[in-house]
Each structure stands twice: as C-alpha cells, then as structure tokens.
Amino acid sequence: MKVLMLNGSPRKDGNTSIAVLDRLFYSSHFDKTMKVGASVVCARRGGCSATFDELNKYFTISNMPIASSQYWNSIHGREQGEAQMDEEGKQTMRVLARNMVFLMKSIALGKEKFGLPETEERVATHFIRERRRLLK
C-alpha cells in the first residue's frame, strides 16, 4: 500500500498540529516503515525552522524516509493569498513535490527488486548506566 504523509502547519499553530500528530503516531497501528513523509510550514516571518524540525521528528522515529527540497519546506505569508507571492517558497514546494514522487517510485522499484530492509525488534533503553561498574 502506498502511503504518503505530508505534515503541514502554520508556525503559530504548531502546538495544535503537534498534539494531533502525537495522537496519530501513538495510536496508529499500521507499519509506517518506508512510507514517504514530508513537512511543510507557513509563517509570517520567522520560526519555520524549529517547527519544520519538530514535524520531521515523527518521520525519523517511524523508519520513514523524508522527502526534501532545495531549502527548508517553508513558505511565507501573513494574510490569505500572501503565500502566493513567495516565489522562492512556491519553487521549494514544486521541487518537493517532484522529489516526493521520485522517492516514492524509487522505493516501490527497490521494494520490488530487493525487498524491504530487514527489521529488528525494538529495544528500549535509558541513558543511566550502572555506576559501580564505572568506579572499579
């Protein structure tokens, strides 16, 4: 099954999007491995890179390849229709779309020819180590 996931969020409403994604990624029980993901952010001026980074983390913890573009996948505008004037942002989105299609086709061909990468059972650890061993 081909699944494409595109996260989009206005910078000011990032926390709302994050709450939805937290629930979606926590409660969904389908394997997201090798499903292509991409994040797109819109802002008046700044803050795109932090939101973009936060949205992409859902993909990286789910074995999902991330489609990229020529720049961070952001577009700028404050009022309705202003993003249409962001020529660099629109070009970034067009390049992203082409790269996503290419990546999805490449993964499909690779899966057909080579299969999916071997998976491992997830191991959960923490960063605390036994202190006694270190002191000896």
Question: Language model features by range: what are they?
Answer:
Residues 39-41, 59-61, 78-79, 115-119:
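Short alpha-helical linear motifs
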Residues 1-14, 19-73:
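Helix-loop-strand module that forms the ligand-binding subsite of alpha/beta enzymes
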Residues 1-28, 84-136:
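N-terminal beta1-alpha1-beta2 submodule of the flavodoxin-like/Rossmannoid cofactor-binding fold
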